[in-house]
Swiss-Prot record:
Keywords: Disulfide bond, Glycoprotein, Protease inhibitor, Repeat, Secreted, Serine protease inhibitor
Protein's name according to its UniProt entry: Ovomucoid
Pfam families: Kazal_1
Record-marked site positions (Reactive bond 3): 18-19
Disulfide bonds: 8-38, 16-35, 24-56
PANTHER family: OVOMUCOID-LIKE-RELATED, SERINE PEPTIDASE INHIBITOR, KAZAL TYPE 2, TANDEM DUPLICATE 1-RELATED
Ranges for domain Kazal-like: 6-56
Locations listed in the record: Secreted
Organism: Syrmaticus reevesii (Reeves's pheasant)
Length: 56
């Protein structure tokens, strides 16, 4: 089984678009899009990971 990952190297960003392309984090929380997810990854100091694409 391949690990799912997202490149968050260009984050954090000060503002995210409202585009809805959900990602499910390892905290079992659904993030609205890559920007929201990656900002949360940065805030968690890298402890948050991607569980899967789509809603949790």
């Amino acid at each position: 089984l391949a690990a799912v990952s997202v490149d968050c190297s260009e984050y954090p960003k000060p503002a995210c678009t409202m585009e809805y392309r959900p990602l499910c984090g390892s905290d079992n929380k659904t993030y609205g899009n890559k920007c929201n997810f990656c900002n949360a990854v940065v805030e968690s100091n890298g402890t948050l990971t991607l569980s899967r694409f789509g809603e949790c």
